[in-house]
Curated annotation (Swiss-Prot):
The gene is eryB. FAD binds at residues 8-36. Catalyzes the oxydation of D-erythritol 1-phosphate to D-erythrulose 1-phosphate. Belongs to the FAD-dependent glycerol-3-phosphate dehydrogenase family. GO terms for molecular function: glycerol-3-phosphate dehydrogenase (quinone) activity. It comes from the Bacteria. Induction: Induced by erythritol and repressed by EryD. This is D-erythritol 1-phosphate dehydrogenase.
């Protein structure tokens, strides 16, 4: 039998936390392997509300530390990846029967001041009868508030962390479940099997970090044959996508009768993303889907506030994700903490660091603190480095995306503006690697519809572990929303026959 490949840190899970840990650790000089059983971000991390935010509603549950840390991270990430993260203004129509105005004002005051806000504008009060933001809102709502948060392309955030990890020397394995992990001589023997090829590999790792998200306890019990007193609480969150039904770049946040809040955000130009629900989930994470009751719930919440009424047939697409929240014993799924918790098991001198909970916004800090927990295992590793480091594509002067975008348009005068915008927003400073020297549209290869060309496909396969048409259409990009059914089918057929994937 071949000698196992050696590494310092073996990361299980290719969602945002796993990719973040792999990048952080590799940048400290550790030899890192990450294994993901499906595609990067295929689980929870591509099915979020796509916000980098402090979490305004968490203030009601007195999560002041969590909100403060998330607000601080919001600015860090805005600087690190201004191409995939950008500021958004949220309009909150005031509904007196749901929360008194003084309470909303207090929450927004705290939100403005808890995190040392530097870049984003503060809160302002709106007269919905006079201010243009009130135009689509029903006349019964006369007062509102406007505040700042940030938007993020969640699946690309994961992919860019994985790219960043690989550029620091990490090995990234997708569609590669860990089939077994056992302690041996103060370390771990980890066996993986590639689902596509059947190839098995064996690694000798000093330490495992379990970032399996909804599957974290499966890994603890069934893969590592370990135990933990901690647990996750699975909470299902569903979103719907509809045609955008208001003018303006602002988003809306509405209060529902059940005290939950619903985001109504501009999405992919001419669409709107509406969510989320919060429902305790008992099923397999792989099987999660938005049900009719949830879709009706979201439509009803929107129709309470807007003049234009959504109907079921307006729903273009829906998706659902399972949030693996740390089980803090709270009964109400909305009240369960969004904070993260580490559980370090050093049985036999072979450390297993299990990660419970967390949210997109705090992934970088989670990774950094996770590495602090392992400092005694790797005393020679480098120090913290990610706070001021751009993510791949985010190497943009002063994190000034607008100036960068103008330069990009000047660089590629032959490109339609929508295509320059698409490349700039997904790839940032790496756009030149996607274009790969092309001098005209024909140089980008086959055109699949919309702003979708062959050069982008080849880049994603070569640089971002895209293995299937679905990986590209739904996660590395959102082309599925901009192609006709016939165009999608034609691309899938072309991709399946092009033999691009080694």
């Amino acid at each position: 039998m071949a000698e196992p490949e050696t590494c310092d840190l073996f990361v299980i899970g290719g969602g945002i936390n796993g990719a973040g840990v792999a990048r952080d650790a590799a940048g400290r000089g550790l030899k890192v392997v990450l294994a993901e059983k499906d595609d990067l971000a295929q689980g929870t991390s591509s099915r979020s509300g796509k916000l980098v935010h402090g979490g305004l509603r968490y203030l009601e549950y007195y999560e002041f530390r969590l909100v403060r840390e998330a607000l601080i991270e919001r600015e860090v990430l805005l600087n690190a990846a201004p191409h995939i993260i950008w500021p958004m203004r949220f309009v909150l129509p005031h509904s007196p029967q749901d929360r008194p105005a003084w309470l909303v004002r207090l929450g927004l005051f705290l939100y403005d001041h808890l995190g040392g806000r530097k870049k984003l504008p503060g809160t302002r009060t709106l007269d919905l009868k006079r201010d243009p933001e009130g135009t689509p809102i029903l006349d019964q709502y006369t007062k509102g508030f406007e505040y700042s948060d940030c938007w993020v392309d969640d699946a690309r955030l994961v992919a860019l962390n994985a790219v960043g990890a690989a550029e620091k020397g990490a090995t990234i394995l997708t569609r590669t479940p860990v089939v077994s992990a056992r302690r041996e001589n103060g370390g771990w023997i980890v066996e993986t099997r590639n689902s596509d090829t059947g190839e098995t590999r064996t690694f000798r790792a000093r330490c495992i970090v379990n970032c399996a998200g909804p599957w974290v306890t499966d890994v603890i019990h069934n893969v590592a044959a370990s135990t933990s007193s901690r647990n996750v609480r699975l909470v299902k969150g569903s979103h719907i996508i509809v045609p955008k039904f208001w003018s303006g770049a602002n988003a809306y946040l509405v209060q529902n009768h059940d005290k939950r809040v619903i985001f109504i955000n501009p999405y992919e130009g001419d669409k709107a993303l509406i969510g989320t629900t919060d429902i305790a989930y008992e099923g397999r994470a792989e099987d999660v889907a938005a049900d009719e009751k949830e879709i009706d719930y979201l439509i009803t919440a929107v129709n309470r506030y807007f003049k234009e009424k959504l109907r079921r047939e307006d729903v273009l697409h829906s998706f659902s994700g399972v949030r693996p929240l740390f089980d803090d014993g709270k009964g109400n799924p909305s009240a369960v903490t969004r904070d993260y918790v580490f559980d370090l098991d050093e049985t036999g001198g072979a450390p297993l660091l299990n990660v419970f909970g967390g949210k997109i916004t705090t992934f970088r800090e989670l990774a950094e603190r996770g590495m602090h927990r392992l400092k005694h295992i790797f005393p020679q590793m480098g120090g913290d480095w990610t706070h001021d480091a751009p993510l791949p594509g985010g190497e943009i002067a002063n994190a000034d995306y607008e100036t960068f975008a103008n330069t990009l348009r000047d660089t590629y005068p032959w490109m339609p503006r929508t295509l320059v915008h698409h490349y700039g927003r997904l790839y940032g400073a790496r756009t030149k690697d996607v274009v790969a020297g092309a001098q005209n549209l024909e140089g980008l290869g086959r055109h699949f519809g919309g702003d979708f060309h062959e050069a982008e496909v080849r880049y994603l396969v070569a640089r971002e572990w895209a293995k299937t048409a679905e990986d590209i259409l739904y996660r590395r990009t959102k082309h599925y929303l901009h192609l006709t059914e016939a165009e999608r089918a034609a691309f899938v057929e072309w991709f399946d026959n092009a033999n691009l994937v080694a």
